[in-house]
Amino acid sequence: MANTTSAKKATRKIARRTDVNKARRSRVRTFVRQVEEAIASGDAAKAKEAFLAAQPELARAASKGVLHSNTASRKVSRLAARVKALSVTTTA
């Protein structure tokens, strides 16, 4: 339990920041899930559209410190590869 005033304030700030970060992380997961669902359905156009929406969300999460920048880059890279592979298989 925080005893000093500054420690109590720090606890309040941490709680607020935790709530914001949870919301951001949830938002990122939603966008990534939409891309994965579009890939699973086999719709290349929908997958590309979802990927283009997810990419800035991942970048924003990385810039805000919710995700490590390497983690965000890895997720973007892997999703891009899957979307590209899907578009190649549907056109060929």
From Swiss-Prot:
This is Small ribosomal subunit protein bS20. Pfam families: Ribosomal_S20p. GO terms for cellular component: cytosol; small ribosomal subunit. Gene3D superfamilies: Ribosomal protein S20 (1.20.58.110). InterPro entries: Ribosomal_bS20 (IPR002583), Ribosomal_bS20_sf (IPR036510). Keywords: Ribonucleoprotein, Ribosomal protein, RNA-binding, rRNA-binding. The lineage of its organism: Bacteria, Pseudomonadati, Pseudomonadota, Alphaproteobacteria, Hyphomicrobiales. GO terms for biological process: translation. Residues 1-23 are annotated as: Disordered. Belongs to the bacterial ribosomal protein bS20 family. GO terms for molecular function: small ribosomal subunit rRNA binding; structural constituent of ribosome. Binds directly to 16S ribosomal RNA.
